[in-house]
Amino acid sequence: MTTDVIADMLTRIRNANQRYLKTVSVPSSKVKLEIARILKEEGFISNFTVEGDVKKTINIELKYQGKTRVIQGLKKISKPGLRVYAQANEIPQVLNGLGISIVSTSQGIMTGKKARLANAGGEVLAFIW
């Protein structure tokens, strides 16, 4: 059992993306559902569904444009041993706005851009480009 569930989710997506798989299954949690929702809103994945009653899993449908991957890279920023926090005006941009940062704020999990607009800082979870 892994202790960093977000890193596990990102690693599963990265591995499936490298193999050009259509779907990837991830054990479900509220945080993972919010990250999947953000990935769908930003156009990085096609869709996601939740299956199962007792042991729920999130099935994420990855997106490709021909043989080109839509998700070029994923990076976990805040780790269990080293948490990374940023104020609203210090939230980093990813590749000058080509990617997104995912931030856990007091108002919920959101992209770095939405967190800046809401003037909410928090823990920087991941970069996706």
Curated annotation (Swiss-Prot):
UniProt superkingdom: Bacteria
SUPFAM superfamilies: Ribosomal protein S8
Gene3D superfamilies linked to this entry: 3.30.1370.30, 3.30.1490.10
InterPro entries, alphabetized: Ribosomal_uS8 (IPR000630), Ribosomal_uS8_CS (IPR047863), Ribosomal_uS8_sf (IPR035987)
A GO cellular component annotation in the UniProt record: ribosome
UniProt entry keywords in alphabetical sequence: Ribonucleoprotein, Ribosomal protein, RNA-binding, rRNA-binding
GO molecular function: rRNA binding; structural constituent of ribosome
One example of a Gene Ontology biological process annotation: translation
Binding partners and assembly: Part of the 30S ribosomal subunit. Contacts proteins S5 and S12.
Similarity comment: Belongs to the universal ribosomal protein uS8 family.
Function description: One of the primary rRNA binding proteins, it binds directly to 16S rRNA central domain where it helps coordinate assembly of the platform of the 30S subunit.
Record protein name field: Small ribosomal subunit protein uS8
